[in-house]
Amino acid sequence: MVKNKNNMAIWGSRIKKDASTLFQKVGNSIDIDKKLFQEDILGSIAHVEMLFRQKIISFKIKNKIIFGLNKIEKEILKNKFEYNKKYEDIHMNIEKRLFQIIGEEAGYVHTARSRNDQVITDFKMWTTSATKEINKNLDNIIKTILKISEKNIETIMPGFTHLKNAQAVSFAHYLMSYVEMFNRDKKRFTYNLESLSENPLGVAALTGTSFNIDRNFTSKKLGFKRPTNNSIDTVADRDFVLDFLYSASVCSMHISRIAEELIIWNSDGFNLITLSDKVVTGSSIMPQKKNPDLLEYLRGKTGTVYGNLFSMLTILKGLPISYFKDLQDDKEILFKSNEILNNSIAILNEVLKNLKPNKQQMLDLANSGYITATDLADYLVKNHSMPFRKAYQTTASIVNYAEKKKKKLNELNIDELKKIEPRLTIEVLKIFNVKNSVNSKKSYGGTSFDNIKKMIMKYKKT
């Protein structure tokens, strides 16, 4: 049996010399993967329970190992556990401590198991929990948006294309577009849970094991749906990491787009919203400044999340199938993206909770830029049997006239309109009211007030 002396790595009986200081520095991952300690302990407990059930170890050994593992968990939770970089990672640190607590019988914990399947089991369990936590945080920000939307159904603002006034919309409808984005993000993360539901434990290094183990038992104990099918693929698989990183990248992109929009709306040129003092900073030289630094932070961090996805893709693209040390970086990459994304969701949630719409400025801007021109074209089609392209040309002529006269469309009188289209009556003037314009878009998914109320209720129920 291997003598697990304190100055020896677990595999020290094969490698006769200590690793160089440089190798120890770059090769150990304990500072990163120690957050897997609970998953590692749970996995080991399930494993030894299975070994006992299959008559591979005795009842006494099983209980001693579980006692030692529970003691280690308490030490870590109370910050009394001493991590040693010599033992590379959390898995070997825990095993080394287990030897110190219960002696040589700790060696049975690794029966029918390799670090390869141990690591990926821990990692999948951690990623499952992280995925569910992100979905909770997305639920929270959706609830925030729904609350703001309920208060602003009849708050009118311009909708933009190319950052130019396009058509009038409800501020609530604009906000509800964010709900759709985050709901898709939730669906993506939820879909990822399926690939995380297969249990790697028991495939050992890459070929499985000659021991009569029960992988269905450990799957059930650890919350997996089923064991993986192929031992080689199991050890090599990091698709679930890519799935997480891709989902995080798309969600970060949504957050960045929203942040960019809020920055623009908060700018002096637009002044559509006011940000709370809680989420802005000042200038070191300009006393009047209130800068949207947190929103700018969200934009910037999106690049890091993107970079992590491409880092992982690049690591994997050159690897033959099975395990290689290159894969050690997978956890640092995923942990970082997870941290950034959760922070970003929390920051945006805080910004939105304290955001104040400048309703009069929104309305004033909605009344500029000939924003009801499309409504006029639609009116001509519906009321004068005019082909849309002809209605488009007629409306363009009216806009050109208003522009020449330096008037808004709602400032034109009926006589001026009849000069261009004689069939128009005074009824057409209602078309130029932006509130009427917004409320007329009754097609499913449109910006009418009833549509918005129904969509808010739909999401509140789910």
Curated annotation (Swiss-Prot):
PROSITE patterns: FUMARATE_LYASES. GO terms for molecular function: argininosuccinate lyase activity. It holds the Pfam family Lyase_1. It catalyses: 2-(N(omega)-L-arginino)succinate = fumarate + L-arginine. Pathway: Amino-acid biosynthesis; L-arginine biosynthesis; L-arginine from L-ornithine and carbamoyl phosphate: step 3/3. It is found in: Cytoplasm. The keyword Transit peptide does not apply. Its EC number is 4.3.2.1. One of its GO terms (cellular component) is cytosol. Gene3D superfamilies: Fumarase/aspartase (C-terminal domain), Fumarase/aspartase (Central domain), Fumarase/aspartase (N-terminal domain). It comes from the Bacteria. CDD domains: Argininosuccinate_lyase. It is an enzyme of class 4 (lyase). GO terms for biological process: arginine biosynthetic process via ornithine; L-arginine biosynthetic process. NCBIfam families: argH (TIGR00838). Belongs to the lyase 1 family. Argininosuccinate lyase subfamily. This is Argininosuccinate lyase. It comes from Pelagibacter ubique (strain HTCC1062). The gene is argH.
